[in-house]
Amino acid sequence: MTQIPMTLRGAEKLREELQHLKSVLRPQIIAAIAEAREHGDLKENAEYHAAREQQGFCEGRIQEIESKLSHAQIIDVTKIANKGIVIFGATVTVLNTHSEEKKIYQIVGDDEANFKKDLISVNSPIARGLIAKKISDVAVIHTPGGEVEYEILDVKYC
């Protein structure tokens, strides 16, 4: 598996979720399975089957997070000499040249992306179009709705 780019905040968020799954959810599910077993016949025990299904989802998510963290390339943009260039982890202020709308995006890893919070995946069309550009450059982004031009107004690394 290739390395997965991730911010410090994104890695910490995954570690917190992993800790919650292992120390809170997993014991709850084990207790639910034990309680359901006490009800007798497992073939027709809906509580038992629901708990086992939940256990499968929990264990699958634990494995997924552990795999991502083991392949994570944690990037701290504050320690990179970047000289105003848009890179992974940067917070970019852009101006849509057609609508004159300003937007601020932070380029993050796939697990951290949340478009409603203006956190865009490094693999998104917008991020791919902005990366390696600098202040005052115009990036042409190819979207399903057509081309959008963004002028880069500011780049921060925090």
UniProtKB/Swiss-Prot annotation:
Gene Ontology terms for molecular function: DNA binding; RNA polymerase binding
Pfam family, one: GreA_GreB_N
Isomerase among keywords: no
InterPro entries, per the entry: GreA/GreB_C_sf, TF_GreA/GreB_CS, Tscrpt_elong_fac_GreA, Tscrpt_elong_fac_GreA/B, Tscrpt_elong_fac_GreA/B_C, Tscrpt_elong_fac_GreA/B_fam, Tscrpt_elong_fac_GreA/B_N, Tscrpt_elong_fac_GreA/B_N_sf
Keyword annotations from UniProtKB, A to Z: DNA-binding, Transcription, Transcription regulation
Source species, domain of life: Bacteria
Gene Ontology BP terms: DNA-templated transcription elongation; regulation of DNA-templated transcription elongation
Family to which the UniProt record says this protein belongs: Belongs to the GreA/GreB family.
HAMAP family xref list: GreA_GreB
Its biological purpose: Necessary for efficient RNA polymerase transcription elongation past template-encoded arresting sites. The arresting sites in DNA have the property of trapping a certain fraction of elongating RNA polymerases that pass through, resulting in locked ternary complexes. Cleavage of the nascent transcript by cleavage factors such as GreA or GreB allows the resumption of elongation from the new 3'terminus. GreA releases sequences of 2 to 3 nucleotides.
Protein name (Swiss-Prot/TrEMBL): Transcription elongation factor GreA
